[in-house]
Every structure is written in C-alpha cells, then in structure tokens.
C-alpha cells in the first residue's frame, strides 16, 4: 500500500477509467468533497514519481470535475460547469456539459440548444460522468433536461445518453447560454414521471456501464405494486451506424417543449432483473455504484442484498436469465467496484480494506490491512489498464489522498 498524493487538499477519483493508457498516471479533480462541485482544475499524478501536472484550468468562474481517460490515447473528458455563472444560470444537474481535452486543447463534447426548434444531436441540459466506450469511439453520460426543469422540475428525470462521433453540432445560438459540440448526442433510455406500479416503466435511468462497445446497462427505478421504488437492471442495444444514430422514432430525438428527448428508432431498453418478490428487492443505492460489465461483455456485475440483508456482488448474463450471487461475505460490500482488465477479478472495499474477488469462485483476497486512520473511500476502486495496480482514495492528515497497491495479478 502506497500513498501517491500528499498536497494539503482533497483529491477525487472518478469510479472508472482514472488511469492513463500506460498505467503510469492517475487523473483526478480537486473538489473539497464528492458532493460539492467547486474544483478549478483537472490534474494527474505520476504514480511512480509523485509528479503532479495540471491538465486543465477552468476559466471565467467555472468549475470542473469527474474526469475519465480514453482507453488508448491521452484524451480526457470531464464535467464543466457554466462560465460566468449568474443568478439565472448556475451549476446544476441541468446546467453542466462534457469537455474533452487532448494535447492541451479543450473542446465541447455535447452541444446545447434550449430554444425551439430544438436541434437533433444537441442536448437541452446537463451531461454528467462521461465514460468512453472500451474502443474509445463513443462516450456515455447521464443527463438532466433544462427545458423540462423550467416547466416543472418533476418532469426533469435523470436519463442515460451517448455521444457518438458524428458531429459537429451547431445550434442556432438563440440564447446566450447555447453552444456547439463535437459529438452527436442522444438519449438511449426512456423514462416516465408516473411509472405504472409493477411494470417495466421507470422514472430514473442512471449509473450506466458499457457492455462491449454497442450496449449499455444501467439502473432503472421501477415501482412495486405498492408504489415503492425498486431499482432494477436494464440493458439497451445501440445503433450500428451513423444513420441509425440519426434516425428518429415516433417522437423527436431533440424532444419537444413538453417531452424529453427520445432515443433513436429501435433503441429500446430491456429489463434484465425482476426482484420485486425478493425479501430485499432491487439493486442497492448505498453504496452508490455503477453497473459494470466484464471486459468480455458477457456478464454485468451489480450490488444487491442477499436473503440475510447483506450487500453482495451479483452477476447477470448480458443476454438475460437469473442473477448469480458471486460473493457470500458476512458483511456489506462498502464501495463502487471495477473489473480487472483480464476479467478474472473485481476490486472493491470490504471490511474497510481493499479486496479482490475472483470473478468465478467469489473467493476474496485482501490487498490491504485494516487501518482506521486511512479507511478507503466508497467512491472508487480502480484497476490500472495493465492490471498490475489498483487505486483508491483514503484520508491522510485531514485530506483525501490517492493510494495504490499492487494486485499480484
């Protein structure tokens, strides 16, 4: 176990894709806590030398955070808050965007168009937690809608979207907050403010993960027959070509003044888990986690309680079937998780220690000892691309610092 950062400030890792492709640098932001969005820089640290470099500094009163890295290039994408924020336009779920940086040059990922007629391929609100597909060709994100938020915040439902490399998108610029973007952006999930109890309808789509390069899994909040929220696992197949991404279904890709943007034609989510009758229904929201497929794209991992109420890791075949309980721990898994690049193991926090779980047998190997002064954060446990290291956050002398251990794999 090795401490990587030492500066007297906080360091925040995203929950996946936090390493450069050469496995030498960890990227981070400098939010004072994961819940606030007041960091000014995106930075990286060399895990061998401790050298720190600034990748991007936010201009004009803006803030930045939640950075991830392209799988094969030194290309970074992160959340960017509004420049020159004022009383009418401040950072919020529906007021933020993706920005990509490569070789020191920054560009907008998503375009914004909030005036009618809305522009297909542009968003009408904020994108968040941008993650490259395994081949680096596309970027997934979660989304909130400014237009519907202005009409009624109850209509502004969290959804999942994808940025595909078929831009640029140039809105009309009829509002001073509108901007162009490099990628064609659409939603791929479908929500309703009033899901029918006991149905497959959802009012929130979130915490998505790539399944190969052409599918996304995500958590969708269903309602039980008694009206209780039950988070279930969903999957959606993505279009195969540019025409597919740009072909509208029965409702407009860009949405209307009263409806959310719609997925392209034929892009329809499918429910994979049916847990309403379990003793502890649904995927857990605590710890917050993102559903994650193995590198082979065959199994999707998620967290759910067992019959004793303990949070365990479960696997679901991407094609469907019954979920399989992988871990049988005595205590809750305490964090988000990632897969080893071989697919042979999954890393997370258990018993306040960094744990490796065999992805076939569920056997646990601990990489760290219990250390009350440096308890790992629940936010992120991330393998390096070469599989030899694993990184996390833990406090040291009052600040959240970055730590690393060898995996032995």
What spans do the regions from the language model cover?
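Sequence signature of WD/YWTD-type beta-propeller architectures
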Residues: 1-409
């Amino acid at each position: 176990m090795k401490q990587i950062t030492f500066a007297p400030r906080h360091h925040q890792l995203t929950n996946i894709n936090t390493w450069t492709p050469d496995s030498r640098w960890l990227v981070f932001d400098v939010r004072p806590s994961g819940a606030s969005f007041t960091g000014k820089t995106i930075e990286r640290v060399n895990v061998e030398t401790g050298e720190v470099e600034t990748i991007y500094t936010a201009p004009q009163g803006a803030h930045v955070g939640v950075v991830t890295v392209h799988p094969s290039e030194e290309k970074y994408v992160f959340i960017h808050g509004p420049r020159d924020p004022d009383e009418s336009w401040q950072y919020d779920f529906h007021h933020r965007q993706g920005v990509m940086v490569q070789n020191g040059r920054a560009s907008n990922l998503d375009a914004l168009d909030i005036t009618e007629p809305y522009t297909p391929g542009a968003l009408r609100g904020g994108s968040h937690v941008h993650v490259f597909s395994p081949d680096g060709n596309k970027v997934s994100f979660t989304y909130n809608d400014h237009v519907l938020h202005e009409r009624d915040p109850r209509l502004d439902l969290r959804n999942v979207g994808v940025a595909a490399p078929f831009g640029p998108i140039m809105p009309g610029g009829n509002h001073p907050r509108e901007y162009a973007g490099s990628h064609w952006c659409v939603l791929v999930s479908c929500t309703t403010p009033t899901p029918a109890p006991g149905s497959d309808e959802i009012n929130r789509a979130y915490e998505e993960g790539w399944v190969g390069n052409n599918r996304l899994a995500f958590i969708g909040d269903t309602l039980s027959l008694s009206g209780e929220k039950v988070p279930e696992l969903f999957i959606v197949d993505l279009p195969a070509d540019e025409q597919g991404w740009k072909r509208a279904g029965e409702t407009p890709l860009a949405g209307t003044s009263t409806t959310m943007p719609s997925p392209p034609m034929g892009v329809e989510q499918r429910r994979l888990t049916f847990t309403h009758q379990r003793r502890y229904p649904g995927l857990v929201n605590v710890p917050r986690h993102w559903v994650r497929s193995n590198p082979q794209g065959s199994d999707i991992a998620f967290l759910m309680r067992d019959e004793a109420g303990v949070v365990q890791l479960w696997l679901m075949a991407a094609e469907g079937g019954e979920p399989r309980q992988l871990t049988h721990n005595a205590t809750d898994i305490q964090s988000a998780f990632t897969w080893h690049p071989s697919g042979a193991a999954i890393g997370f926090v258990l018993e306040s220690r960094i744990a490796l779980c065999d992805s076939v047998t569920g056997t646990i190997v601990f990489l760290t000892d219990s250390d009350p002064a440096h308890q790992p954060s629940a936010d992120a446990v991330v393998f390096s691309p070469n599989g030899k290291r694993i990184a996390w956050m833990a406090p040291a002398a009052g600040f959240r610092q970055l730590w690393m251990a060898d995996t032995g794999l």
